[in-house]
């Protein structure tokens, strides 16, 4: 009976992959990097939609989301159907957490972005309605100083107008950074993001 269930599960998994359906899985949560494989890192201020983006890429809910900022407080690791590794980092800049918790999150982020980490690329996610904040600029400078490839993802563009989007792209141009306007909710431009993850 167990072998029969396993067989049908494998057939189902194969058909999903063949039909282009995303087969992602959650691995584990860690206070530090617990994998030595190359990985893509997602970081941003609290409540910019990092976990929602993971779910959109996976085409299913594998990352916990919340309207309350500060939900993610550890490094959350995922793998996609191509066995590529993704990391959802804690959000920075959430004022409502205690100083102790804030320092803990800062240590986790700083510890992750050490120069010897196997990071293929970092994707810094913004809330397109808010744009760049001082904390974002600090994080951008830090990541670049550490020598990692950096992309900007301006999320929630479905809630912005053309003028706001133009301003964001101009700011990215001044920073000499690749910027992609996306909506994790409506899946706008996720195919372009997938190309960056190849």
UniProtKB/Swiss-Prot annotation:
Keywords from the named record: Cell cycle, Cell division, GTP-binding, Magnesium, Metal-binding, Nucleotide-binding, Septation
Domain EngB-type G: residue ranges: 36-198
List this protein's GO terms for biological process.
Answer: division septum assembly
Any single Pfam family the record assigns to this protein? MMR_HSR1
Any one cellular component term from GO for this entry? cytosol
Required co-factor(s) are: Mg(2+)
* Residues annotated to bind Mg(2+): 51, 72
Q: Which InterPro entries match?
A: G_ENGB_dom, GTP-bd, GTP-bd_ribosome_bio_YsxC, P-loop_NTPase, Small_GTP-bd
Single GO MF annotation: GTP binding
List of residues binding GTP:
44-51, 70-74, 88-91, 155-158, 182-184
Cross-referenced PANTHER family: ENGB-TYPE G DOMAIN-CONTAINING PROTEIN, MSS1/TRME-RELATED GTP-BINDING PROTEIN
Role summary: Necessary for normal cell division and for the maintenance of normal septation.
Query: Which HAMAP family is this protein grouped with?
Result: GTPase_EngB
Q: Which family does it belong to?
A: Belongs to the TRAFAC class TrmE-Era-EngA-EngB-Septin-like GTPase superfamily. EngB GTPase family.
- Recorded protein name is Probable GTP-binding protein EngB
Q: Which organism is it from?
A: Mesomycoplasma hyopneumoniae (strain 232)
What is the primary gene name for this protein?
engB
């Amino acid at each position: 009976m167990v072998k029969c269930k396993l067989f049908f599960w494998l057939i189902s998994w194969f058909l999903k992959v063949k039909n282009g359906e995303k087969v992602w899985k959650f691995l584990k949560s860690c206070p530090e990097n617990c994998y030595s494989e190359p990985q893509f890192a997602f970081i941003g201020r609290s409540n910019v939609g990092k976990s929602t983006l993971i779910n959109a890429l996976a085409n299913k809910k594998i990352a916990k989301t919340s309207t309350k900022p500060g939900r993610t407080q550890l490094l959350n690791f995922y793998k996609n159907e191509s066995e590529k590794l993704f990391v959802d980092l804690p959000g920075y800049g959430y004022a409502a957490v205690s100083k102790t918790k804030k320092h803990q999150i800062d240590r986790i982020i700083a510890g992750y972005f050490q120069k010897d980490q196997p990071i293929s690329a970092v994707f810094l996610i913004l809330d397109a309605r808010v744009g760049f904040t001082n904390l974002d600029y600090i994080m951008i400078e830090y990541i670049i100083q550490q020598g990692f490839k950096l992309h900007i993802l301006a999320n929630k563009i479905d809630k912005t107008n053309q003028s706001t989007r133009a301003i964001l792209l101009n700011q990215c141009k001044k920073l000499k950074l690749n910027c992609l306007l996306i909506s994790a909710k409506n899946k706008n431009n996720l195919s372009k993001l997938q190309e960056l993850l190849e």
